[in-house]
């Protein structure tokens, strides 16, 4: 079975009656994505397109580096796993251990640096 970097997720029609309005609206269940959020679509698309470009230019396979507080790193890791690409994610010290384990379980190398995402991102850009 071929892995993909995103899943087609259901769009569920819901009714809201809060005393002020009676409205129908739609909820997209993006939490069912491999990375658990909508970020799997955008980041996965960017990685796929960038890898195709690198291959067509003869640069070889892409290696992916991401800074993240959690969800973007997990999306990058799951996309890279589906495309057999190496991935490294820099997260700040404030990232929950559970998220670090998820990113690692998706196959990425995790580097913990900085007190917040900005410091993790700065480290990635200059290392």
Curated annotation (Swiss-Prot):
Pfam families: PALP (PF00291)
Pathways involved: Carbohydrate biosynthesis; gluconeogenesis
Any Gene Ontology CC annotation: cytoplasm
Coiled coil regions in record: none
One example GO MF annotation: threonine deaminase activity
EC number(s) stated in the UniProt entry for this protein: 4.3.1.17
Listed cofactors: pyridoxal 5'-phosphate
Domain of life: Eukaryota
GO biological processes: amino acid metabolic process; gluconeogenesis
Family the UniProt entry places it in: Belongs to the serine/threonine dehydratase family.
Protein name: Putative truncated L-serine dehydratase YIL168W
Gene source species: Saccharomyces cerevisiae (strain ATCC 204508 / S288c) (Baker's yeast)
């Amino acid at each position: 079975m071929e892995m993909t970097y995103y899943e087609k997720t259901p769009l569920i029609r819901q009714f809201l009656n809060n005393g002020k309005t009676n409205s129908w609206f739609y909820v997209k269940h993006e939490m069912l994505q491999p990375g658990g959020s909508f970020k799997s679509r955008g980041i996965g698309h960017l990685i796929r397109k960038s890898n195709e470009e690198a291959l067509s230019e003869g640069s070889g396979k892409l290696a992916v580096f991401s800074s993240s507080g959690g969800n973007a790193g997990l999306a990058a890791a799951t996309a890279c796993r589906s495309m057999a690409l190496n991935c490294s994610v820099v997260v700040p010290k404030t990232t929950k251990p559970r998220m670090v384990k998820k990113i690692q379980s998706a196959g990425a190398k995790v580097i913990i640096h900085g007190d917040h995402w900005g410091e993790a991102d700065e480290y990635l850009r200059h290392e």
